[in-house]
Swiss-Prot record:
This is Trypsin-1. The keyword Disulfide bond applies. The keyword Disulfide bond applies. PANTHER family: TRYPSIN-RELATED, TRYPSINOGEN 1A-RELATED. It comes from the Eukaryota. Belongs to the peptidase S1 family. It comes from Gadus morhua. GO terms for cellular component: extracellular space. The record marks 189 as: Required for specificity. The active site is at 59 (charge relay system), 103 (charge relay system), 195 (charge relay system).
Length: 241
């Protein structure tokens, strides 16, 4: 199982053509917190949480990267984009590459983002979302479709699953810093290239796209870093760094 997860994560880092599965094109700039992490190509997503900081997944770590904000069509300059380099990239101190626990990192920008209708921050949680809450995951990851235009930001509505359903899907692998969201019957999921991107529930960042067994497979929903559990570290780091 570990090797399968490792392959998925490698795909998340290196696959340029990877998109959301079973979703739809987001309304343009409706996910204005969504960013693309770029090192000459899109390799992961992220979320703007203040004018100076982006949240992403720790497994997306690169010591230097460029953050692209205000994107919709990732291969077309639409005049709404902002490109800002990282000044610091900080993984959670207890991140484990073995079991992908505490899969969260912060990126400090070299200059503040200009907040406008195309670029704005998403709120951090003050409490965890309840089971069955409907959320939106977005990204430029693998659509596994010949129809969907994955160069345009894709969205997917999906419910938070119970801890029991999540643990049953991945026995012995789910920690308190993870949750599952999606459909046990399969067919809809985040996928490679979506890693690090947002799961937003009622306007609040509750999840970071982390890992899973394949994409959109039956009884194997997507697994996400649980931001409500990790938000203390996020807030402390932003305040003190």
């Amino acid at each position: 199982m570990k090797s399968l997860i490792f392959v998925l994560l490698l795909g998340a880092v290196f696959a340029e053509e990877d998109k959301i599965v079973g979703g739809y094109e987001c309304t343009k700039h409706s996910q204005a917190h969504q960013v693309s992490l770029n090192s000459g190509y899109h390799f992961c997503g992220g979320s703007l949480v203040s004018k100076d900081w982006v949240v992403s997944a720790a497994h997306c770590y690169k010591s230097v990267l460029r953050v692209r904000l205000g994107e919709h069509h990732i291969r077309v300059n639409e005049g709404t984009e902002q490109y800002i380099s990282s000044s610091s990239v900080i993984r959670h101190p207890n991140y484990s590459s073995y079991n992908i626990n505490n899969d969260i990192m912060l990126i400090k920008l070299t200059k503040p983002a200009t907040l406008n209708q195309y670029v704005h921050a998403v709120a951090l949680p003050t409490e965890c979302a309840a089971d069955a809450t409907m959320c939106t995951v977005s990204g430029w990851g693998n659509t596994m479709s010949s129809v969907a235009d994955g160069d345009k930001l894709q969205c997917l509505s999906l419910p938070i699953l119970s801890h029991a359903d999540c643990a049953n899907s991945y026995p012995g692998m789910i920690t308190q810093s993870m949750f599952c969201a999606g459909y046990l019957e399969g067919g809809k999921d985040s996928c490679q290239g979506d890693s690090g991107g947002p799961v937003v529930c009622n306007g609040v960042l509750q999840g970071v796209v982390s890992w899973g067994y394949g994409c959109a497979e039956r009884d194997h929903p997507g697994v996400y870093a649980k931001v409500c559990v990790l938000s203390g570290w996020v807030r402390d780091t932003m305040a003190n760094y």
